Amino acid sequence: MAKLDKIRNFSIIAHIDHGKSTLADRILEITGMVSEREKKDQYLDKMELEQERGITIKAQTVRIPYKANDGEEYILNLIDTPGHVDFSYEVSRSLAASEGALLVVDSTQGVEAQTLANVFLALDHDLEIVPVLNKVDLPSSDCERVAQEIEEVIGLDCSEPLMISAKTGLNVEDVLESIVKDLPAPQGDPDAPLKALIFDSWYDSYQGVVVLFRILDGTIKKGDKIQIHSTGRTFDVTTLGVYTPEPQKAKELAAGEVGFLCASMKELNDAPVGDTITLAADPVEDPFPGFQEVKPMVFCGLYPVEPAEYEPLKAALEKLQLNDTAFSFEPETSTALGFGFRCGFLGLLHMEIIQERLEREFQAKLIATAPSVVYQARLNNGEVLEIDNPSKMPDGGDLESLAEPFCRLEIHVPNDYVGAVLKLCEEKRGIQKDMRYLTSSRVIITYEVPFAEIMYDFFDKLKSHTKGYASLDYEIIDYRESNLVKLDILINTDPVDAFSAIVHKDSAYPFGRSLALKLKRAIPRQMFEIVIQAAIGRKIIAKERVAPFRKNVTAKCYGGDITRKRKLLEKQKEGKKRMKKMGNVEIPQEAFMAVLKAGED
């Protein structure tokens, strides 16, 4: 067992692409945790998608023995955290398991929005923060400016920042010395009752659920009967150990240490992230604060292209859910698409990742409907319904009011693009709250915007308006009443539920027109006329028609009586009428994606 004063638990905070995983790689190499043979980039990002997108999705830990310059042996526990805003709850739990954090900032870029969000999370947990300027070997590096930014924006003393290059390994030794010297040792009593924080968990097909935890007080041994605080369920610890970075078994772990355990748990809900582990024989009364159940905020329908693929898709979704409690799904049926699932996600990146994993790991062929947020409908009898699908919207007569989620956007942008960003936020029904200059050339703009407005193309538009220089962070703040209506799309007078959307009344007409036009372009011509209508209730607000193919039925008539030709044309007309009544309109996948791009024209 390690002595408390020789342990350092730390996280690395960084914006995407500022070099967090690369710094972790160098630390593992310098301390000899990864041999030359095993060496590879992004060592801790095990998932193929993490490697490819260059992002960290799941938290990982590594126990690193390190002999410092003072001759003492220290145990450094690196707790690797996701950096993206969708996974902010995981980040807050990982930070709660640490005493300190390395703030890695790209010296060519400066402080970005998501870095800032995670730094403030770290400060909320009273973490000691060490600023590290990365990529100093690049010619465009400007350490003085970035150090000044860190001091002004975050309020950290940055008079002597660590200047490193994680890629080449320059000065990474100094980072390890700084962890030992500047970060505090954990507090805790190994003899007190057990109290440990779960900061991540995943499902292993051999061992069941693997739980990553940090012990605050007490000691845990293999064979102990543990209790999960929020559920009250008890389990026997079958495996206990630490990651170095490969799993290594241990007989016992004590206060201040970070490790993993398996206890024959069958599903992730048995060990929710942020929960407290105690001993069943001696449970603690006060659990670790800040535990919350993660709620999905974005919903969309996922349908198999072939009806026969329904069961394999269900099995794939169940497997993904084993590793991701924030992801939820339930069966639903659509008149247009048949049987499928309504899936809930933390945010847009989370949705993209799940869809990509389904296609990649399970070879699923999917039709995805447009994502929607959760609305709150207040009925005349006072009841409040949560609506995650436009087709569940109650009738107008029963409805008293509709509320939608609002989020606070914090956009970091160079001075030259402020006008373009303000215009974009105003278009999205945003309310400006604040605008302050970090430096003479960089601005932070704060807006409150309906979450539904940033769902589809806000990120893309923001990047294109600012030539890729803007960075963004958002958090959902509250629900507000809005003048919202349900827009239906009718194809040959039949409503198609997959195209329904809830939109603001002011933008309903342009949105409906744009969507009808996009569908007209996406739906191929057929032997009969296709009429596309956009409607609010019974009022048609836009109409487009796809003209039918025309077969020349009179081609075989050479001269002769006009009545013969007329008879053939009448017969064709009758046939087309019957076809229109009976015929099914084939709607391609591109048409479902048209909903996402509606309103752009």
Curated annotation (Swiss-Prot):
Membrane topology summary: Peripheral membrane protein
CDD domains: EF4_II, EF4_III, LepA, lepA_C
Class of this enzyme: hydrolase
A GO biological process held by the record: positive regulation of translation
Keywords: Cell inner membrane, Cell membrane, GTP-binding, Hydrolase, Membrane, Nucleotide-binding, Protein biosynthesis
Compartmental location: Cell inner membrane
SMART domains: EFG_C
UniProt keyword Chloroplast, yes or no: no
GO molecular function: GTP binding; GTPase activity; ribosome binding; translation elongation factor activity
GO CC annotation: plasma membrane
Enzyme Commission designation: 3.6.5.n1
Domain tr-type G per the UniProt entry, residue ranges: 5-187
Residues holding GTP: D17, H18, G19, K20, S21, T22, N134, K135, V136, D137
Catalytic activity line of the entry: GTP + H2O = GDP + phosphate + H(+)
Family note: Belongs to the TRAFAC class translation factor GTPase superfamily. Classic translation factor GTPase family. LepA subfamily.
Purpose: Required for accurate and efficient protein synthesis under certain stress conditions. May act as a fidelity factor of the translation reaction, by catalyzing a one-codon backward translocation of tRNAs on improperly translocated ribosomes. Back-translocation proceeds from a post-translocation (POST) complex to a pre-translocation (PRE) complex, thus giving elongation factor G a second chance to translocate the tRNAs correctly. Binds to ribosomes in a GTP-dependent manner.
UniProt-recorded name of the protein: Elongation factor 4
